[in-house]
Amino acid sequence: MATDIARLIDHTLLKADATKEQILQLCKEAQTYQFASVCINPYWVKLAAEQLKEDKHVAVCTVIGFPLGQSTPETKAFETKNAIANGATEVDMVINIAALKDKQDQMVLNDIRAVVDAAKDKALTKVILETCLLTNEEKERACALAVQAGADYVKTSTGFSTGGATVEDIALMRRVVGADVGVKASGGIRDLAAVNAMVEAGATRIGASAGVAIVTGATGSSGY
């Protein structure tokens, strides 16, 4: 059971003050518990890839255009290619939230597609919506655009804004993307009950900094 739960979790450490020692510990924990991935800032990708090169079950996930999503599609594409060159096999990109709110759907589509194309056949792409900043209509539109762009997953949150994952948002996202696209719940998930609620609502991946606490039955602290 704990292993099944662990395989859903992106073991996450995205704080600006994370140290090399902490990243190495994150990788060690990911190997011990067999988490789906470690999710880290781009600076640490090369180190994590080196640490995990003998482990075929733990992916190296990083973030693109993070946490605001306000860099250009060209910049996001470069970040993606650079991360993959350094060993990333999954990328979580933040959409252009302003463009979505301005109803510039073609811009949002191009932005997501720039990352999807840069990652094609080399890394999974997860699209972060930052749901706490969006209306339900905007969430639906963002999900539809992510599917149209060819993304592998849609994801709720960066963990750095005003809110995290909710069961309601996961259910909405699952309804819009259908069965063939993954849904990642992230932000504020700190215990097994929260994981189970998200999975029941339709999540197929969980982003959490409290992965060890979740699989061992403790309660994790806040923070991403």
From Swiss-Prot:
Pathway involvement of the protein, from the record: Carbohydrate degradation; 2-deoxy-D-ribose 1-phosphate degradation; D-glyceraldehyde 3-phosphate and acetaldehyde from 2-deoxy-alpha-D-ribose 1-phosphate: step 2/2
Pfam families (alphabetical): DeoC (PF01791)
GO molecular function: deoxyribose-phosphate aldolase activity
Designated name of the protein: Deoxyribose-phosphate aldolase
Keywords from the UniProt entry: Cytoplasm, Lyase, Schiff base
HAMAP family: DeoC_type1
Chain's gene name: deoC
Enzyme Commission code(s) on record: 4.1.2.4
Subcellular location as annotated: Cytoplasm
Active-site residue numbers: 92 (proton donor/acceptor), 155 (schiff-base intermediate with acetaldehyde), 184 (proton donor/acceptor)
GO cellular component: cytoplasm
Keyword Cytoplasm listed: yes
Annotated source species: Shouchella clausii (strain KSM-K16)
Enzyme class: lyase
SUPFAM superfamilies: Aldolase (SSF51569)
